[in-house]
Amino acid sequence: MNQIVFTAWVLLFPAACTTLGAAGVFLLRRRSRPCTQRILCGMAAGIMLAASVWSLLLPAIQRGQTLPLPAWIPSAVGLVLGAVGLLQVEQFAGQLLAGGAGHGGRMVLAVTLHNLPEGMVAGLAAALALTGEPDAISGALALSLGIGLQNIPEGAAVSLSLIHISEP
């Protein structure tokens, strides 16, 4: 496969999946029922929680087993630091958007901050795959597929929430 086509696929597939999920808002009525919105938000949260636990937290605990302290401590410290960092970003965003952007502006900022590291990781995986090593190529494809599948319900939940916020 051409390197440019491969890199474009790895980078654009997650974005296309987000767009696909967000396009679901056009299939529903202008103002979705609260039940539909709760189901989609719950599904997106469940997928993100599962991805966090099984793809990040458990592998981090496994890698921590080589350290001289209990394996869960580095992961717990990282989890707490991440939560504190998120609270700091939340406070900063509140001050930044206090001028009237409201909930919609906060949501757009949150989605941007969330997708930035995803794009960076996909780009790094694509760059590593260009070395030609089979593990790097399959890893980049799997990462792109995993991020993309997570982005479908995420895009739906965000678009439905933005529609709900924007209407009186």
Regions found by a protein language model. Give the residues of each.
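Cytoplasmic-side transmembrane-helix entry/capping segments in multi-pass membrane proteins
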Residues: 35-44, 100-105
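Generic transmembrane alpha-helix signature in multi-pass membrane proteins
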Residues: 24, 105-148, 152-162
